[in-house]
């Protein structure tokens, strides 16, 4: 399989709107018109149940992992740069799905899948950042933004200090590029956070979150 065909495969696989299809199939709802109107795991879980949300999360992560892994197996001559290209194609497919009129999700879970294959330690660090921000503010969107911003930093420090290896500027540059894209896809969330109208991941967390922040 040559480079263009595999890159196209990566885009198409990334563009599969699992969240939209699962919500439509099992709840009969168009997830794009409810809640945060996002097709990702958080909106699915919030609206039709977290068992479905976690399924969507796993599938969206797999959309990022699969193209990167398969490109390393079937197009090894492409090396890390081509694996990264396939990862970017998968993320762009998720953000601009042709199945949904070239609209899509935020790309966070798919990005996690891409770099889970390439830089697992950095991904675990980003997950930790996400969890800390989420526990304090109760916003998945804010946790995702902070995790995407810190991912390149965690990668650089973990590579140098823990693995004692040289930083790949291909990997670092791709992380920065995708992180910028994720921030752009969250621009409406940022506005809602500033306006104090952002939805919490779990119903009932709003009062708990406000009370906890007031105590601090």
Curated annotation (Swiss-Prot):
- Can you tell me where the transmembrane regions are? 3-23, 48-68, 82-102, 112-132, 142-162, 166-186
In which organism is this protein found? Leptospira interrogans serogroup Icterohaemorrhagiae serovar copenhageni (strain Fiocruz L1-130)
Q: What class of enzyme is it?
A: transferase
Q: What protein name applies here?
A: Glycerol-3-phosphate acyltransferase
| Assembly with partners or alone | Probably interacts with PlsX.
So what does this one do?
A: Catalyzes the transfer of an acyl group from acyl-phosphate (acyl-PO(4)) to glycerol-3-phosphate (G3P) to form lysophosphatidic acid (LPA). This enzyme utilizes acyl-phosphate as fatty acyl donor, but not acyl-CoA or acyl-ACP.
Mind listing the UniProt keywords for this protein, alphabetically?
Cell inner membrane, Cell membrane, Lipid biosynthesis, Lipid metabolism, Membrane, Phospholipid biosynthesis, Phospholipid metabolism, Transferase, Transmembrane, Transmembrane helix
* Source taxon at top rank: Bacteria
